[in-house]
Each structure stands twice: as structure tokens, then as C-alpha cells.
UniProtKB/Swiss-Prot annotation:
Top-level taxon of the source organism: Bacteria
Gene3D superfamilies according to UniProt: Hotdog Thioesterase
Gene: fabZ
Protein name: 3-hydroxyacyl-[acyl-carrier-protein] dehydratase FabZ
Entry similarity comment: Belongs to the thioester dehydratase family. FabZ subfamily.
Keywords: Cytoplasm, Lipid A biosynthesis, Lipid biosynthesis, Lipid metabolism, Lyase
Amino acid sequence: MMDIKEIREYLPHRYPFLLVDRVTELDIENKNIRAYKNVSVNEPFFNGHFPEHPIMPGVLIIEAMAQAAGILAFKMLDSKPSDGTLYYFVGSDKLRFRQPVLPGDQLVLEAKFLSSKRQIWKFECKATVDGKAVCSAEIICAERKL
């Protein structure tokens, strides 16, 4: 549904911090999104986390979920970063890690809009690999005008 070219229109992140490779489902009416991150052994973070037993850092899994949520927020408002608005990841609730993400895994990212109040948006997010939960959290983002 969204290729990397279109994703780059909705996320200000760039290599090595752009963590969404593809969006396959985006349902504005039901306020949810499904996106993917293909985890390659060539990711720069594997050089130090951990060279002999590479594991994707948990904070980057959270960031990937937040980026998927950001795309959903922009699409819900029919806006883009180029319009002068950004969403900053400002917190999480109910955060849980369930298993490690390894080189070669395909991370499935899902986000559902829960609520917004005074430019603070909350999303229910989860990440899975091969149908197994690896991370879940309520992600909180702040909308900011540039």
C-alpha cells in the first residue's frame, strides 16, 4: 500500500534511523496500520549489540512501532512533515518485550489509534515476528508545529 518512496514523504527519518520499510495495510476509518521492518545482519547497530550474538535493541523496536504510529497520525490528518508538523515520541505505557529480534527476521508493526487530547496522541502498538509477539506498548506522541 505504501512503498519506501511514499513512506519517506510521511516520516522525516533517514538512514540509519528510518525503521519502516513497507506499509501493507492502512485503514483510516478503523484507525490502524500494519507495516514491516526487514531486519538485516547489515544493520549498523549489530556491530555493537552484540557482535557474537546480534539482537535488535529494544529501543529500536519501540521506535519502529512509533514510526508506524506516526504514519497513521499523518494519514489520519491528511498531512505530512513538509506541512510543518512533526510527531515526537514522548512516552510509553504497558511496555513489554517478549522475545529477541534477530538478523533475518521480518518485524511486523501494528498500531491502532486510541485517543488524542491537546496534541498528545496515544496508540496501541505491537510488534511480531512469524506471528509471535516480540513487543507491545501504548505509544504516546506529541504533535508539534515547526
